[in-house]
């Protein structure tokens, strides 16, 4: 495989940053373009730490800017598209989520065809497959089952529509006469150092006597460590560029997980943070069916008030369902086609994440000390 180049969208995000860190170590990589919507001093510092012979080009722009995307794609061999509006709680406007996740993805696909980029990898979500009900029990789901989410909520709907567009684009004829090859990686909840979701959980718990509020007691899931999620993207990029492997990858979607034990999200939060004195809230909580119907009531109130007032419920039925369902996946297809094996073991992932949580605890203590002086 000759020298190549890659564009990573969402490069400033939790997953995107880790992909870039791994990508620059790839052999014969000549250039990596990193697309940011906003480029902070922290992002600049992270890029300065990269040790690579490849040229690193920073691009600041919007995923819904067609002209910008066409310029960004010129001369690229591979696109890794991680940029997305992630919102399961319903706080972002529906149109914003659809614009970023659906329109942005389609504009990027169009730019690839125009710029004759031969390979495209999409960071999808297990949410495109479900769960559709908290009453469902889905264990070790496989791609062959072809499950599909029926939710109309903007996040799962938009990711499903975007994935369909990506896979439908496979086989398109590029402007130079070549063929466009695409695939999608369906990711569950991603944990690890720098996770904004875990950071928020920790900071809230620190303000609550180190007690972690329960939100997902009834779930059984298999989250994936960020390093392993990123590694799957690197393997997909290799595979689509390899004439021998590409044939079996083109137009396919893959579940990506690792050896993290199947557990509830609440238990995961506790396991990762217990070394620092955190504990789970032991107080009484609403039964799941009642919580679900309360969410329905709040959604109804929001709908009725919409002509007069923009009321955003604190939770909705989709959020209650996805956080309290039994839904696990198998990554055997990724093993077979991509050669995927987790790079980081559960024990190592747990240790790395716990150590990072320790730095958050220390920062909190330093802040309290400063305020008390």
Curated annotation (Swiss-Prot):
> Which residues are named in the active-site annotation?
159 (proton donor)
Q: Recite the UniProt keywords alphabetically.
A: Acetylation, Endoplasmic reticulum, Lipid metabolism, Membrane, Mitochondrion, NADP, Oxidoreductase, Steroid metabolism, Transmembrane, Transmembrane helix
TM segment ranges: 288-308
State the reactions this protein catalyses.
Answer: a 3beta-hydroxysteroid + NADP(+) = a 3-oxosteroid + NADPH + H(+); 5alpha-androstane-3beta,17beta-diol + NADP(+) = 17beta-hydroxy-5alpha-androstan-3-one + NADPH + H(+); 3beta-hydroxy-5alpha-androstan-17-one + NADP(+) = 5alpha-androstan-3,17-dione + NADPH + H(+)
Q: Name one GO molecular function term.
A: steroid dehydrogenase activity
Subcellular localization: Endoplasmic reticulum membrane; Mitochondrion membrane
Q: What is its main location?
A: endoplasmic reticulum
Task: Point out the signal peptide segment.
Answer: none
Annotated InterPro entries = 3Beta_OHSteriod_DH/Estase (IPR002225), Lipid_A_modif_metabolic_enz (IPR050177), NAD(P)-bd_dom_sf (IPR036291)
Q: In which tissues is it expressed?
A: Expressed predominantly in male liver.
Functional pathway: Steroid metabolism
Task: Please provide, in alphabetical order, the Gene Ontology terms of the cellular component aspect for this entry.
Answer: cytoplasm; endoplasmic reticulum membrane; intracellular membrane-bounded organelle; mitochondrial membrane
How does the record say this protein sits in the membrane? Single-pass membrane protein
Q: Which residues carry this modification: N6-acetyllysine?
A: 350
Q: What class of enzyme is it?
A: oxidoreductase
List residues binding NADP(+): 10-15, 155, 159
EC number annotated for this UniProt entry:
1.1.1.270, 1.1.1.210
Q: What is one process in the GO biological process aspect for this record?
A: C21-steroid hormone metabolic process
The domain of life is: Eukaryota
Q: Which family does it belong to?
A: Belongs to the 3-beta-HSD family.
Protein function: Catalyzes the conversion of dihydrotestosterone to its inactive form 5alpha-androstanediol, that does not bind androgen receptor/AR. Also converts androstanedione, a precursor of testosterone and estrone, to epiandrosterone. Does not function as an isomerase.
Mind telling me what this protein is named? NADPH-dependent 3-keto-steroid reductase Hsd3b5
Taxon lineage: Eukaryota, Metazoa, Chordata, Craniata, Vertebrata
């Amino acid at each position: 495989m000759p020298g190549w180049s890659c564009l990573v969208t969402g490069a400033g995000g939790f997953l995107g940053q880790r992909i870039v860190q791994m990508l620059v170590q790839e052999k014969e990589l000549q250039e990596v373009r990193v697309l940011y919507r906003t480029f902070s001093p922290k992002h600049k510092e992270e890029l300065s730490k990269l040790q690579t012979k490849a040229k690193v080009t920073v691009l600041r722009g919007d995923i819904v800017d067609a002209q910008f995307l066409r310029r960004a794609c010129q001369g690229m061999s591979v696109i890794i598209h991680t940029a997305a509006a992630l919102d399961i709680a319903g706080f972002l406007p529906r149109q914003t989520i659809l614009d970023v996740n659906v329109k942005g993805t389609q504009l990027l696909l169009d730019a690839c065809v125009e710029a004759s980029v031969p390979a495209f990898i999409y960071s999808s979500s297990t949410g495109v497959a479900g769960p559709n009900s908290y009453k469902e029990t889905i264990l070790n789901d496989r791609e062959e089952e072809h499950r599909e989410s029926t939710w109309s909520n903007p996040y799962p709907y938009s990711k499903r529509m975007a994935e369909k567009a990506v896979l439908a684009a496979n086989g398109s004829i590029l402007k130079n006469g070549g063929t466009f090859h695409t695939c999608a990686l369906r990711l569950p909840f991603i944990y690890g150092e720098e996770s904004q979701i875990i950071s928020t959980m920790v900071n809230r718990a620190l303000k609550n006597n180190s007690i972690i509020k329960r939100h997902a007691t009834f779930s059984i899931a298999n989250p994936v460590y960020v390093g392993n999620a990123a590694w799957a993207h690197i393997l997909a990029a290799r595979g689509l560029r390899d004439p021998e492997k590409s044939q079996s990858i083109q137009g396919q979607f893959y579940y990506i997980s690792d050896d993290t034990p199947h557990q509830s999200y609440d238990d995961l939060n506790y396991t990762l943070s217990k070394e620092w004195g955190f504990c789970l809230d032991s107080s009484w909580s609403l039964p799941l069916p009642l919580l679900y119907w309360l969410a329905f009531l709040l959604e109804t109130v929001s709908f009725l008030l919409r002509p007069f007032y923009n009321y955003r419920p604190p939770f909705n039925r989709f959020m209650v369902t996805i956080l309290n369902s039994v839904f696990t996946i198998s990554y055997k297809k990724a093993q077979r086609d991509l050669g995927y094996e987790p790079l980081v073991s559960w024990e190592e992932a747990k240790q790395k994440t716990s150590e990072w949580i320790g730095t958050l605890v220390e920062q909190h203590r330093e802040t309290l000390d400063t305020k008390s002086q």
